[in-house]
C-alpha cells in the first residue's frame, strides 16, 4: 500500500483527514493568495464534507473552486479523483487538476502528477497537456497575470521535452509585466536558446505583449 499523501485541509490550518482506508498525513498549508470570503467558506465546507466522508459533496465544491483557479482546491480535487472518492476514479481528470495545482505553486502536486502520469498512456497524457494549455491561454486572454508565468512554466515542465523558446517568450512577457520571478526565469530559459533565434523570439514576445490586456493584481 502506498504512503498517504498530504492534502490541503484549510487555508492556513493543518488537519488530519482520511481519504483512504489508512490514516492520511496532515494537510499541507495553502500557498494560495488571499481569497474572497465566500471562496474560503466554500473551501472550508468542502473540507468538512471530506471529514464527514461526504465525498460527493466535497468533489462538487472543490470542482467549483478548481474551475475558479483555486490551486489548493485543484490539488484536493485531484486527490479525490485519484482515489475514486466522491466520483469514479479518473486519472485523466486528476492529472489535469494536479498539473494546474503544480503550476499554481502547490508543491505536493508534483509527486501526485508524476504518479498519475505513470498510470496513463501517452495519448491520454497528450490530451491532458492540450487541455491544460487551452485553459492557460483562455486565462491569459481574460487578462489573468498569474497565467502568464504559469504558461511559461508549462512549456518547461509539462511537455515531453522542454520548449525553452516558448518559455523564453512567455517569461519575457512576464518580466515586462513585472511579475515576480519572471525576469530570473527568462534569463535561465535564454541560456538554453540558440543565439541566432533570440531576435525572432524577442520580436514574437513583443508582438504578443502588445496584443494582451493583462490585469496586474
Give the location of each predicted region.
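Short helix-capping/linker turns of helical repeat alpha-solenoids
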Residues: 37, 53-54, 67-71, 83-85, ...
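Terminal, low-structured helical/coil segments at or just beyond the last alpha-helical repeat
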Residues: 120-146, 181-217
Amino acid at each position: 500500500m502506498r504512503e498517504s499523501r498530504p492534502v490541503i485541509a484549510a487555508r492556513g490550518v493543518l488537519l488530519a483527514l482520511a481519504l483512504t482506508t489508512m490514516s492520511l498525513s496532515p494537510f499541507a498549508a495553502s500557498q494560495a493568495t488571499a481569497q474572497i470570503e465566500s471562496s474560503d467558506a466554500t473551501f472550508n465546507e468542502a473540507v468538512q464534507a471530506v471529514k464527514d466522508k461526504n465525498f460527493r459533496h466535497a468533489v462538487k465544491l472543490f470542482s467549483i473552486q478548481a474551475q475558479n483557479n483555486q490551486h489548493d482546491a485543484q490539488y484536493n480535487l485531484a486527490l479525490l479523483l485519484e482515489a475514486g472518492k466522491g466520483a469514479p476514479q479518473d486519472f485523466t481528470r486528476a492529472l489535469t487538476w494536479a498539473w494546474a495545482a503544480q503550476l499554481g505553486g502547490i508543491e505536493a502536486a508534483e509527486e501526485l502528477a508524476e504518479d498519475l502520469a505513470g498510470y496513463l498512456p501517452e495519448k491520454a497524457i497528450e490530451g491532458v497537456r492540450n487541455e491544460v494549455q487551452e485553459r492557460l491561454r483562455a486565462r491569459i486572454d481574460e487578462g489573468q497575470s498569474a497565467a502568464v508565468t504559469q504558461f511559461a512554466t508549462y512549456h518547461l515542465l509539462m511537455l515531453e521535452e522542454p520548449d525553452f523558446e516558448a518559455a523564453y517568450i512567455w517569461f519575457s512577457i512576464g518580466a515586462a509585466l513585472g511579475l515576480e520571478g519572471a525576469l530570473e526565469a527568462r534569463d535561465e530559459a535564454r541560456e538554453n536558446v540558440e543565439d541566432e533565434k533570440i531576435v525572432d523570439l524577442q520580436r514574437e514576445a513583443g508582438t504578443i505583449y502588445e496584443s494582451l490586456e493583462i490585469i496586474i493584481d
